[in-house]
Structure formats: C-alpha cells, structure tokens
Amino acid sequence: MAKARVYIPATYAMLAELEETGSLSARSGWGFMVTPALQDFYTEGDEEEIAYSAFLEASMASMRLLAIGDEEKFPHRRVVISVDLDDSVITPRPDMGEPVVELQPAQFSKDDLAAIHVDIAESEETTAKAIKAIDTADLGDEDAELAVGDALDKFMAFYHPTELPFLVELL
C-alpha cells in the first residue's frame, strides 16, 4: 500500500504522550500534506517547496493548539510531527484549505514517524507573540500577521524518530 508524508500539528505534551503510549491521535483528525489542490495552487516551485508550505501550515496549527493555553511544560514551542501514513487513511479536504487532510483513523504510531520538529528555546519569545496574535491575524490585522510571520520564519530543530525518548526526557 502506498504511503504519503503528513505533517501533524502537535505540542510537547502530545510528544510525551506518543513516547509514553506508542501512539497518538491527530487532534480532531486533521493533518497537512502536499495535496492535488496545493499543487494546483502553486504555478511554480518544486515538490520540496510545496511540501514546506504544507509544513508551515502545520506549524501554524501548532500555534493554534498552544493558544488553547493548557500546555504546561513548553507553552511557546511549536511541534510538528511528520508521519508516513497509508493513502487509505488520508482524505484531502480542499474545502478546509489546500493542504488540509482528514485522517481516518486519526491515530498513528511511533512506527509511522518520519521526523519531529520542535521550536528552539531562542524562538519562544517570538512564538509567544504569534500565539497571542494568531486569531487577530486570521481576521486580517497586519501587525498580527507580521507577528505570526515572524514566528513562521524561525528555525525549528529537526529530530530523528529514534530521538523521541531523549527529546521527551531531556527537554
């Protein structure tokens, strides 16, 4: 069965749950990936650039999860979990946005992991500002959009799937 790369917005607590239980459900069953609608949206750019735009959407969704305000350990660090899932569990939802996909079932395991990206400590202040501004940015406020853009421009550290236990323990 063919597999596709899906970017799952997450939080540090979700990483800890994945390490502890061996599986995790994508919040509300949503993920982001290179979909036909996203490819059609871009008139130029290679596959990697298009995939990066889907990744950025997942990192913005991570900010929305952080905006809920229930993250105790790292309330200002975005997390994106990259997984390779069977095509059969993925349904593109262009009505929700070009890179948006619905996952059924929404659950994935550590075996599906391809990569983990987490904000570095130096990005926390910028991400904190973006978290406060993200809803206002959605309404078109230019200053809020700039704050969110500043956070999206920040480097997220890459971790190999085998580093998950150390990432959870040492951070």
Predicted regions and their residues:
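Short, structured protein-protein interaction patches enriched in aromatics and acidic/basic residues
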Residues: 30-44, 71-89
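Short glycine-enriched loop/turn motifs at secondary-structure junctions
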Residues: 1-2, 74
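Alpha-helix initiation/capping motif
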Residues: 11, 34-35, 46, 140-142, ...
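Intrinsically disordered, low-complexity boundary segments flanking structured domains
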Residues: 14-20, 63-70
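N-terminal interaction modules that seed assembly of large macromolecular complexes
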Residues: 22-66
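Glycine-rich, aromatic-bearing surface loops/beta-hairpins
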Residues: 74-76, 83-171
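Short, extreme N-terminal segment that most often corresponds to the first beta-strand
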Residues: 2-28, 33
